[in-house]
Amino acid sequence: MEDVYDLFQRGTRLLEEGEFHQATVPLRKAAAIEPEKASIREALGRAYFRSGHYEEAAVEFGAVVELAPTNDYALFCLGRSLLECGRAQEARKPLTLAAQLRPERRDYRIYRERAAKAA
């Protein structure tokens, strides 16, 4: 069995190199071994999002939000993933929460407003 840390490191390295689809392979394996590890689920969500798999990204970011409800980045990414899936109404809540948690983040406010207009 492969070590979770090695799988996570390989996946994040591939993410950094722009190999988003390839990054999902070790990150999926790591998430299967340690599904309660928010850092793994967040990295997998990022890999899915960057490879255009928005539904899968929403699932992963949703899992991170369940594990860490005040993780502003996960809330933001969940909202963005839902927007990309055409689910603007659902995207409003996580985007609003992210913007409230980090009011200095202009990008959070922009996407919150986009979701409100699209809903």
Short names for language-model regions:
Residues 62-84:
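Mid-chain, well-packed structural core segment of small domains
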Residues 17-28, 51-63, 85-97, 119:
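Structural signature of tandem alpha-helical TPR/SEL1-like repeats
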